[in-house]
């Protein structure tokens, strides 16, 4: 048994994930029943990540702040600026792509269980109310805005505690981090189960009818990941951005693509930030915050599908209305994590700017759920990998 574990560790996590990915595709394609059964591995893996992430964020932030000493620099502000700027550029990119490659949708009738927010005020209100949630409830419901708020408050309070108390908090933080490493080590099995189940259940035919809209969506996300984000990093650091970009895509993006959950990928990003040698005082705050408000992929989804609906209905989109849509998408995307259904349920809000009827907007949402196996995966991979990318760029390790 020890020799097997040693061999498993020697191969490395990324090669094992690739092996799991290939095996998952083959099993899901050739033996669908086995693929569906293996889906339990993926469910358990995502469940374990989601279970450990809230307590990890709470303890890590609390420990980092309680042990912070005046004079130790933190780099949260520049990361937040990059989050917002990057999301706005993603929204503009989606608008440009929608004009270059106008897409018409074959609308479908479907029942959407979730209720979309009525207006932007409701989105922002939900986001602010998350700040004052009960701390135990926030951890139980993975409300990261609430978790961060309480962890910061308690962390400041613990600065007045004895050295022994702060040491205990630090030791507990180290213990939770070790648990996260053990969970992440099981990623190849989780990816195997997730991929096998997805291929077995959806196949490849279901997405063929939506190839054009998928190409626009994924093309925008690739453009942000491989062109726009590197330009932001180049301006910020003055260095070749691609080594860091590819590290983040490989170590964070691949896992996020298959888990389809920014929250579940928080432990993965925390582990990567630690491997990169970044300041814990910074990444313990910016990474969970990024999982909540850094939503470039969501902004792309909102704009592309909204403008596709406008093109389908023959609605003329002016430059001013497109710019307004980008601003609304940027702000709305920041609240996407607080809306059931995420970015897709914010489409009716954006569609209202063009007086698109709500029943049509909900049909567009239904299309979003159909293509979600690709759209949501790519969106999460972009969002989550960008969290650690921008955090690293703001760190002196990657400064000029």
From Swiss-Prot:
GO BP, sorted A to Z: serine transport; threonine transport
Superkingdom of origin: Bacteria
Annotated GO CC locations: plasma membrane
SUPFAM superfamilies: Proton glutamate symport protein
Residue ranges crossing the lipid bilayer per the database entry: 11-31, 45-65, 81-101, 138-158, 175-195, 213-233, 242-264, 295-315, 327-347, 354-374
MF (Gene Ontology): neutral L-amino acid:sodium symporter activity
Keywords, ordered alphabetically: Amino-acid transport, Cell inner membrane, Cell membrane, Membrane, Symport, Transmembrane, Transmembrane helix, Transport
Family membership: Belongs to the dicarboxylate/amino acid:cation symporter (DAACS) (TC 2.A.23) family.
NCBIfam families membership: PRK13628.1
Protein name (database record): Serine/threonine transporter SstT
Organism: Psychrobacter cryohalolentis (strain ATCC BAA-1226 / DSM 17306 / VKM B-2378 / K5)
């Amino acid at each position: 048994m020890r020799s097997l574990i040693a061999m498993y560790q020697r191969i490395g996590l990324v090669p094992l994930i690739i092996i799991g990915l290939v095996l998952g595709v083959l099993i899901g394609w050739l033996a669908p029943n086995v693929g569906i059964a293996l889906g339990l591995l993926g469910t358990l893996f995502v469940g374990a990540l989601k279970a450990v992430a809230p307590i990890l964020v709470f303890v890590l932030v609390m420990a980092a702040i309680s042990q912070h000493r005046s004079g130790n620099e933190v780099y949260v502000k520049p990361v937040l600026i990059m989050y917002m700027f990057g999301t706005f550029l993603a929204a503009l990119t989606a608008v440009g792509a929608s004009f270059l490659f106008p897409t018409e949708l074959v609308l479908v009738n479907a029942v959407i269980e979730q209720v979309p927010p009525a207006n932007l005020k409701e989105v922002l209100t939900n986001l602010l109310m998350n700040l004052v949630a009960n701390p135990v409830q926030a951890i139980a419901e993975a409300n990261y805005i609430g978790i961060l708020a309480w962890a910061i408050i308690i962390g400041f309070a613990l600065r007045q505690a004895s050295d022994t108390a702060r040491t205990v908090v630090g030791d507990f933080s180290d213990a939770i981090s070790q648990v996260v490493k053990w969970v992440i080590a099981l990623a190849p099995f989780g990816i195997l189960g997730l991929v096998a189940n997805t291929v077995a259940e959806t196949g490849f035919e279901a997405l063929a009818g939506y190839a054009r809209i998928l190409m626009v969506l994924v093309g925008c996300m690739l453009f942000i990941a491989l062109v726009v984000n590197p330009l932001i990093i180049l301006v910020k650091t003055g260095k070749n951005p691609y080594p860091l970009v590819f590290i983040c895509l490989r170590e964070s993006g691949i896992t996020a693509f298959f888990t389809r959950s920014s929250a579940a990928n928080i432990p993965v990003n925390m582990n990567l930030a630690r491997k990169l040698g970044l300041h814990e005082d910074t990444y313990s705050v910016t990474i969970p915050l990024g999982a909540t408000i850094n939503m470039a992929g969501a902004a792309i989804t909102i704009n592309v599908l909204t403008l596709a609906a406008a093109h389908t209905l023959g609605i003329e989109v002016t430059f001013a209305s497109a710019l307004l849509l980008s601003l609304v998408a940027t702000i709305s995307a920041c609240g996407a994590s607080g809306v059931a259904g995420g970015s897709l349920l914010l489409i009716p809000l954006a569609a209202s700017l063009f007086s698109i009827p709500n029943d049509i907007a909900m049909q567009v949402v239904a299309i979003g759920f159909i293509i979600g196996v690709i759209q949501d995966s790519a969106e999460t991979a972009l969002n989550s990998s960008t969290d650690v990318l921008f955090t690293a760029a703001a760190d002196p390790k990657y400064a000029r």
